[in-house]
């Protein structure tokens, strides 16, 4: 049971933790012999590392139709995807796959939606395992921007199958989408 003592202008609550009471009164903090202090070590989130970046449409009936995909490391200045190999389930001849990583924001890459059982996807091989901090998708400017809704990004390991990180699907219609790890949403 706690007792309350009033002395002068101070009020002291005496209880099982006299250390806390002493601190409230301006006394010096002394290490509790029962619960020693442990240093606080900040937790720094790790960035995903992968060799493949896969765009997947969550709708089994929609196509992927985008102007550009950019992938950046922590330094953030070099686009790792520029000029890399892009493969797909099937592509539309009006939107060749290399357009996705050519640096030109006015052309586009386009899938065909021929494999309804799995939905459309595009796979970019970065050439080696890279630490990835940011992914930027540029939508088409001339039409069909709503087609980006439902696309998510999956970072895969060196074997091309091990999932390292997966973003949520895009839910809004916009000109560009940026995902910065360890984030939780596209902006």
Task: Locate predicted features.
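Ser/Thr/Pro/Gly-rich low-complexity linker/stalk segments immediately outside membranes or between
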Residues: 26-44
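Disordered, acidic Ser/Thr/Pro-rich linker "stalks" and the adjacent N-terminal cap
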Residues: 42-50, 60-129, 140-147, 166-186
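A short beta-strand element within beta-rich, extracytoplasmic domains
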Residues: 55, 131-142
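Extracellular beta-strand elements of beta-rich domains used
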Residues: 69-71, 135, 153
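Short, surface-exposed beta-strand/strand-loop-strand elements in extracellular ectodomains
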Residues: 144-159
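Preference for bulky hydrophobic residues occupying beta-strand positions
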Residues: 55, 124, 137, 153-155
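Single-pass alpha-helical membrane anchors
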Residues: 2-30
């Amino acid at each position: 049971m706690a007792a309350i003592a009033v002395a002068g202008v101070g009020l002291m609550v005496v209880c099982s933790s006299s250390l806390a009471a002493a601190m409230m009164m301006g006394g010096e903090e002394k290490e509790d012999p029962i619960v020693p202090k442990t240093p606080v070590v900040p937790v720094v989130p790790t960035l995903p590392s992968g060799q493949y970046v896969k765009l997947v449409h969550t709708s089994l009936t929609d196509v992927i139709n985008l102007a550009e995909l950019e992938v950046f490391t922590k330094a953030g200045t070099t686009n790792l995807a520029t000029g890399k190999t892009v493969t797909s389930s099937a592509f539309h001849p009006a939107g060749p796959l290399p357009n996705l990583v050519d640096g030109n924001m006015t052309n586009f890459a386009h899938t065909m939606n021929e494999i309804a059982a799995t939905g459309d996807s595009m796979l970019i091989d970065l050439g080696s395992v890279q630490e990835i901090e940011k992914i930027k998708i540029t939508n088409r400017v001339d039409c069909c921007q709503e087609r980006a809704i439902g696309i998510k990004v999956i970072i895969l390991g060196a074997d091309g199958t091990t999932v390292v990180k997966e973003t949520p699907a895009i839910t809004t219609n916009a000109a560009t989408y940026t995902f910065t790890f360890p984030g939780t949403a596209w902006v």
